[in-house]
Amino acid sequence: MARLRKHYDTVVKPALQKEFNYANPMQVPKLQKIVINMGVGEAAQDSKKIESALAELTLISGQKPVSTKAKMSIAQFKLREGQVVGCKVTLRAERMYEFLDRLINIALPRVRDFRGVPGKSFDGRGNYSLGLKEQIVFPEIDYDKVETIRGMDIIFVTTAKSNEEAKALLKGFDMPFVA
């Protein structure tokens, strides 16, 4: 069992049940999935860019990503419908908790001038989005082999009904929010 999963069951879940006065333990919000998305705009001209992005996302997440395709053609961006424009991976269960552990304890402290993650990136339905400007904050990525610095979006999908519940859940996992 992942370290953060055990932490959720023993510490976070009882604390949230007490804080929000849930009658049933099944009402306590939990993390459903983490989606990591990496957009590669240059993939329209060079297909090797998407291959390196897929390889990096595989190293970061520990599972094979899916390439995302353009839904419609946009002439100004020289983009055709069905053309590969990025990649994403959905993490659930043990891999999700292991990734969250590595993100909070290893990757985020390695971000330059890091003071905390913004606390306003909730969507109103208990989901949280986080953007990273560079993929090299993860220790799995070898800095010398990186062709281009790419950012990524990380979306935390929870069963929480409100932003306050979701923020309390992520704070229970020691997510460093800016005050």
From Swiss-Prot:
The keyword Plastid is annotated on this UniProt entry: no
InterPro entries registered for this protein in UniProt: Ribosomal_uL5 (IPR002132), Ribosomal_uL5_bac-type (IPR020930), Ribosomal_uL5_C (IPR031309), Ribosomal_uL5_CS (IPR020929), Ribosomal_uL5_dom_sf (IPR022803), Ribosomal_uL5_N (IPR031310)
GO molecular function: rRNA binding; structural constituent of ribosome; tRNA binding
Gene3D superfamilies, per the entry: 3.30.1440.10
Stretches assigned to coiled coil: none
Superkingdom in the source lineage: Bacteria
KW Ribonucleoprotein (keyword) present: yes
Pfam family, one: Ribosomal_L5_C
Keywords from the UniProt entry: Ribonucleoprotein, Ribosomal protein, RNA-binding, rRNA-binding, tRNA-binding
GO cellular component: ribonucleoprotein complex; ribosome
GO biological process assignments: translation
NCBIfam families per UniProt: PRK00010.1
Similarity comment text for this entry: Belongs to the universal ribosomal protein uL5 family.
Subunit description: Part of the 50S ribosomal subunit; part of the 5S rRNA/L5/L18/L25 subcomplex. Contacts the 5S rRNA and the P site tRNA. Forms a bridge to the 30S subunit in the 70S ribosome.
Function description: This is one of the proteins that bind and probably mediate the attachment of the 5S RNA into the large ribosomal subunit, where it forms part of the central protuberance. In the 70S ribosome it contacts protein S13 of the 30S subunit (bridge B1b), connecting the 2 subunits; this bridge is implicated in subunit movement. Contacts the P site tRNA; the 5S rRNA and some of its associated proteins might help stabilize positioning of ribosome-bound tRNAs.
Name of protein: Large ribosomal subunit protein uL5
Species, as recorded: Paramagnetospirillum magneticum (strain ATCC 700264 / AMB-1)
